A protein has these predicted regions:
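Conserved structural core of kinase catalytic domains
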Residues: 87, 92-142
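ATP-binding glycine-rich phosphate-binding loop
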Residues: 1-63
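Active-site ExK catalytic segment of metal-dependent nucleases
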Residues: 64-71, 115-117, 173-175
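Catalytic activation segment of kinase domains across protein kinase-like and atypical kinase folds
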Residues: 70, 146-200
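Active-site-adjacent loop/helix micro-motif of nuclease/hydrolase catalytic cores
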Residues: 72-81, 122-127, 180-186
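ATP-binding glycine-rich loop module of kinase domains
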Residues: 42-91
């Protein structure tokens, strides 16, 4: 578990990610929420609805199950931050972590559930109006990115944001993070990537 790479380097981030994966895996195995091979487990999740850059989504009746990789997050803790932020900002579409595992390639995966919603697509203008109404400013229309000084919100397009039959706007998937200066979206927050683990 030694961190040998220089601080603030990409290699250090990767090392921290591996340490976090190892600790989460150990805990998840002890508590019964670990899946050795999510590729095999997928057969019991339901019909495959969609597959994106990081997730495979399965039909589970009134909910969907998502098996999500860390493609956009080197460290598991940052993905878990993303879930917490999503749940804080978009309560109607909360995600709940069910467990953790690895796929057949050995990649670390997080398994979540989310209520299934139906509705109609919104225009980009409607999404922009909604997002600005909840306090965000459009900073990059090419990748649907909005921000406040503290929060970065991206991927707000019409496959991830829609209006339900009840008229409510539902954000089912987005890239939401603490807005740091490195994201180049007016961010003022800082994050520490150092995590201290206490050995049992």
């Amino acid at each position: 578990d030694q961190l040998t790479a220089p601080e603030h380097s990409f290699k250090r981030e990767q090392q921290l990610g591996k340490v976090q994966e190892k600790r989460i895996e150990s805990w998840a195995k002890k508590t019964g929420c670990w899946v050795d091979d999510t590729s095999v487990y997928n057969q019991t999740l339901g019909d495959k609805l969609a597959q994106g850059g990081e997730a495979i989504v399965y039909d589970n009746g009134n909910s969907v199950l998502k098996v999500i990789g860390l493609d956009y997050f080197i460290q598991p803790i940052f993905f878990l931050f993303r879930i917490s932020l999503h749940n804080a900002y978009f309560e109607q579409t909360k995600m709940f972590v069910l467990g953790f595992g690895r796929n057949s390639m050995g990649d670390f995966m997080i398994i979540v559930t989310q209520t299934f919603f139906q509705g109609s697509q919104m225009t980009e203008e409607d999404i922009e109006e909604y997002t600005e109404r909840i306090g965000f400013k459009l900073v990059n229309p090419r990748n649907w990115t909005y921000s406040t000084p503290g929060i970065y919100l991206s991927d707000m397009h019409n496959e991830n944001v829609f209006r339900g039959h009840d008229g409510v706007v539902y954000v089912i998937d987005c890239d939401i993070r603490i807005n740091t200066p490195e994201l180049k979206a007016g961010g003022t927050r800082t994050l520490t990537t150092e995590v201290e683990f206490i050995k049992e």
